[in-house]
Amino acid sequence: MASRSQNRRPAQEVDNTISYVQCDGLAAMKMVKHCHEESLSNMEVAQGALLGLVVDDRLEITNCFPFPKSSDETIDEEEYQLNMMRRLRLVNVDHFHVGWYQSADVGNFLSLPLLESQYHYQTSIEESVVVIYDTQKSKRGFLTLKAYRLTPQAIAMYKEGEFTPEALRNLKVGYENLFLEVPIVIKNSALCNIMMSELAEMVPEEEGTHFLDLGTASVLENHLRSMMDRVDELNQEANKFNKYQQTVIRQEQDKHRMLAKHAQENAARIAKGETAIPDDEITKLFRPPTVPPRLNPLIVSGQINTYAKHISQFCSQSLAKLYMTQALQGAKENKQ
């Protein structure tokens, strides 16, 4: 997972000091190339460092480089990053660390390692962002690059280090306000724009038949399977929390019963003129059970919400294609 090797400032509540992110076309192409190459291998996610600089309220990403594969234990990740930035500095390339990037599947990037990594980045470099590239959606023709930062509530949650229901309730933290999306724009030089205009004229025009492709069952099936897995995981977390609540209730009942019995015994002792026994021993017998952390259920809920949104959007697009196909088929039959 992404790591920071530079000196870290003390954790503090970080406001969003960046209005938007400006990414050079070369850096975007390098991220896309790396993520697609890793998606074809056995690597679950592709990760890398973002280099650039901050100008006023704009974060400029001018270059990037991939992190070494985690399966290679012979490479020191922090030393690798330092050597890369040192060599880039020698060739007059922006070498300031401004964040990191990661690939995602169908936009569902929310995970515990990502939260921890972005927390360390953002408390070390206040303006840092994480750029998420959706490989599956981009394969279908939609370039998806999004930049995110942790919200002040999420920073405060990690700073306190408590993920109990009461702590999350007091901080008003939910899966919908863990991250704040920062607008991202891709900038090319004037020569690149001229070349792209010339290439656009050289590319043959598509007939448009691929837009009516109805082979969408596999995509929808993968979405549903992933969401079912997340629902099962959330159900297991709910069962753990229910068992914890039942344990607390049962312990309180036993404690109340023993205290009542002890009060009767003390009343009898006082009636006999003896000294009452304190309740400290009984209180020590009933230690409160460990509260299960609620961060993982919070993340799983966010993943379910993401899958549900994608399924809803995908189904609406598929229905539109079906209606278009029905209209075209009817027009064809009328001509015949």
From Swiss-Prot:
UniProt xrefs under InterPro entries: eIF3h, eIF3h_C, JAMM/MPN+_dom, JAMM_MPN+_peptidase_M67A, MPN
GO molecular function, a single term: translation initiation factor activity
Domain MPN: 21-154
UniProt keywords, alphabetically: Cytoplasm, Initiation factor, Protein biosynthesis
GO BP: any one term: formation of cytoplasmic translation initiation complex
Pfam families the record matches: eIF3h_C (PF19445), JAB (PF01398)
UniProt keyword Protein biosynthesis, yes or no: yes
GO cellular component terms, semicolon-separated: eukaryotic 43S preinitiation complex; eukaryotic 48S preinitiation complex; eukaryotic translation initiation factor 3 complex
Compartments where located: Cytoplasm
CDD domains, alphabetized: MPN_eIF3h
Subunit structure: Component of the eukaryotic translation initiation factor 3 (eIF-3) complex.
Function: Component of the eukaryotic translation initiation factor 3 (eIF-3) complex, which is involved in protein synthesis of a specialized repertoire of mRNAs and, together with other initiation factors, stimulates binding of mRNA and methionyl-tRNAi to the 40S ribosome. The eIF-3 complex specifically targets and initiates translation of a subset of mRNAs involved in cell proliferation.
Family: Belongs to the eIF-3 subunit H family.
Annotated protein name in UniProt: Eukaryotic translation initiation factor 3 subunit H
